[in-house]
Swiss-Prot record:
Pfam families: DJ-1_PfpI (PF01965), HTH_18 (PF12833). Residues 240-261, 288-311 bind DNA. It comes from Rhizobium meliloti (strain 1021). Residues 223-321 form the HTH araC/xylS-type domain. Keywords: DNA-binding, Transcription, Transcription regulation. This is HTH-type transcriptional regulator GlxA. The keyword Transmembrane does not apply. Gene3D superfamilies: 3.40.50.880, Homeodomain-like. SMART domains: HTH_ARAC (SM00342).
Amino acid sequence: MAASSDSRNVQRIGFLLVRNFALMSYASATEPLRAANLLAGRPLYQIVPLAPGGGTVASSSGLSVGCADLESEGESCHTVFVCAGGEPTDWADTSASHTTLRRLSRLGIRIGGISSGAFVLAAAGLLDNRDFTIHWEHAPALKEAFPHLNPRHARFVLDGGIATCGGGVAPLDMMHAMIAERLGTDFARRVSDWYLHAAVAEPAAPQRGSAAERFGTNHPALLAVLEKMETAIERPLDRTAMARLAGVSPRHLDRLFREHRGTGFLDTYREIRLRHARRLLQQSPLSIPEIAYATGFSSPAHFSNAFKRLFSQTPGSLRRRSGS
């Protein structure tokens, strides 16, 4: 049975560490628990690093963490988070954990995913009909691998027995919510203040900066087009359609790109699509021709030539280096 959430008990919070897990995400999730113990003057939480069979797991920065065995120790945890990094080949190595994660979920243990950990939860079948999130960079690969799933663009999502978070520093916000859930908002505020985390974000807060910050412009017509470019990847819209969306003429749209971006409409759109393609090459199992068509190119050859011009390597060479 899942451990009690009674505030008098010590909650064991497990972290299933996937090889090359993101150390910042792990620290952002565990340090608030340590601070809660310190501020309360008694143990409220026990941090339990986990791995199949135990042993040590190295983070993306090379720091190794000693782990208990997931199978034998998971049942005593109140929550088990899957903490992963950015390498799909590492996510694939977690298949041996899927059965255990499903079993723990059936026992009433909350299961979570941090950074790309939601990909592992999806592969285990734990995200069907659930609200969840994942790091924005991994969302395209997840949607390609699991078309029936639709991650939310949120910093974190608490959906009953499932807790997911985009990673980075967002676990600070998620842990604030989870501590408040158990111990009240006043105590959670004390924990966040301990880390100078004064601006605690709401769950639905965005993971990324605004389009204006990302693209370095505040022009409303240009921003409308740039944001549409980020979503209209597989079936790119032509200049006329984009100009209509922005409420300007095609000629005016061209002028906006030259004046504010220093590059043309087509060049900007192509770069956005190619950067999306690069993420799919690194993180998805799609073939190169499938990625070419999924990013709006008329042929794999056209895609390969454009990719090489921008990144100075072919899609095939990047795929081999990524090990996908």
